[in-house]
Amino acid sequence: MGLGASSEQPAGGEGFHLHGVQENSPAQQAGLEPYFDFIITIGHSRLNKENDTLKALLKANVEKPVKLEVFNMKTMRVREVEVVPSNMWGGQGLLGASVRFCSFRRASEHVWHVLDVEPSSPAALAGLRPYTDYIVGSDQILQESEDFFTLIESHEGKPLKLMVYNSESDSCREVTVTPNAAWGGEGSLGCGIGYGYLHRIPTQPSSQYKKPPSASSPGTPAKTPQPNAFPLGAPPPWPIPQDSSGPELGSRQSDYMEALPQVPGGFMEEQLPGPGSPGHGTADYGGCLHSMEIPLQPPPPVQRVMDPGFLDVSGMSLLDSNNTSVCPSLSSSSLLTPTAVSALGPEDIGSSSSSHERGGEATWSGSEFEISFPDSPGSQAQVDHLPRLTLPDGLTSAASPEEGLSAELLEAQTEEPAHTASLDCMAQTEGPAGQVQAAPDPEPGLCEGPW
């Protein structure tokens, strides 16, 4: 006895349907499954007609193994089973199973799905399970949807045996229920019944028709984690982003980008408790504190829009201070600064539009003048090697200490000792009309030559 090879669905759609299998019977020992199995062949005889062929062949093979071909509705396949008919097993019949000749093509449609089960109802007292139990048969033949409801009405107040299949345990059991319309609720069974295509038994055990899980009890509310929320004054569970020009992009999923949460640095500095605060050192956040040890970098420098009325070259060294061969008496404080530029004269100030380096010299070029300074002027201070300043005739703007230039630097410059004769610092003018080479006023501390 046992299972043999399986094959596809056979031709024809009739066979002997097993409605019930008794315990310890030859049918149970052979592995026959109630409701889902159809005996279509015994020996070499095809059982496609309602006659006594099955009974006769079973009697002819008492206490002898006989092969059966069985079609299963769950797997939709045919398998071979070996059974030993016997009348000594302790029950009724040679197989210990009740059979009925019918078509297995529409047998899966005759199913009544148990839905909601009310507490203390006849269905609940009988042990029917909501959404996983399927009523597949009874003592009477059920072929239409109305047959089941007619059966319930005819057994009002009387016990009724039902064959029930459970999709969770994948097994059939016999349930005895007593319909009672006066149980205190709706209906005679107190349960919902579904019939039709959407309420058929699935080919494999599934939770498709299971009742959705109930909501959490009031005493135990569900906790939903919020990634962007953390206690006030406590460090966040993620490190602070540094020098990020935009949101960091996380994993890409299909057609959208997931942006990881970010916390501004200023916000975290306000939220972190200080050494003297009450909450400092009291909370233990484990590994979260290690992520807060990342040093914060200063913000990028502020880029200011310069006023077109003057040239801001503060903080730039236009001459090599280490080379003293050009101007021995020129100190580091007398380099070209906004104050030094203002000392050149009322017409020596212009607006600049760009600055760049070319050919080993630093050049500031604008729409109105150009200043060039060589990196290495040479071993001797000569006039031809000094930077030249060319201004147009129409330049009339002048800068004053009140417009942004430092008056203190101007006074410090005038206090330096004179190392060059005043006649050598006089202005020299040359070139075509419309171009003027301006020389600074005779002041001590300035080198001789055009600027």
UniProtKB/Swiss-Prot annotation:
GO biological process assignments: establishment of protein localization to plasma membrane; Golgi organization; Golgi ribbon formation; negative regulation of dendrite morphogenesis; protein N-linked glycosylation; protein transport
Gene3D superfamilies, per the entry: 2.30.42.10
Residue positions, PTM Phosphothreonine: 220, 224
Domain spans labelled PDZ GRASP-type: 14-104, 110-198
Residues where Zn(2+) binds: 17, 19, 102
Cellular component terms per the entry's GO annotation: Golgi apparatus; Golgi membrane
SUPFAM superfamilies according to UniProt: PDZ domain-like
Keywords from the named record: Golgi apparatus, Lipoprotein, Membrane, Metal-binding, Myristate, Phosphoprotein, Protein transport, Repeat, Transport, Zinc
Region (Essential for interaction with GOLGA2/GM130): 189-201
GO molecular function terms listed in the Swiss-Prot or TrEMBL record: metal ion binding
Name used for this protein in its record: Golgi reassembly-stacking protein 1
Organism the protein comes from: Rattus norvegicus (Rat)
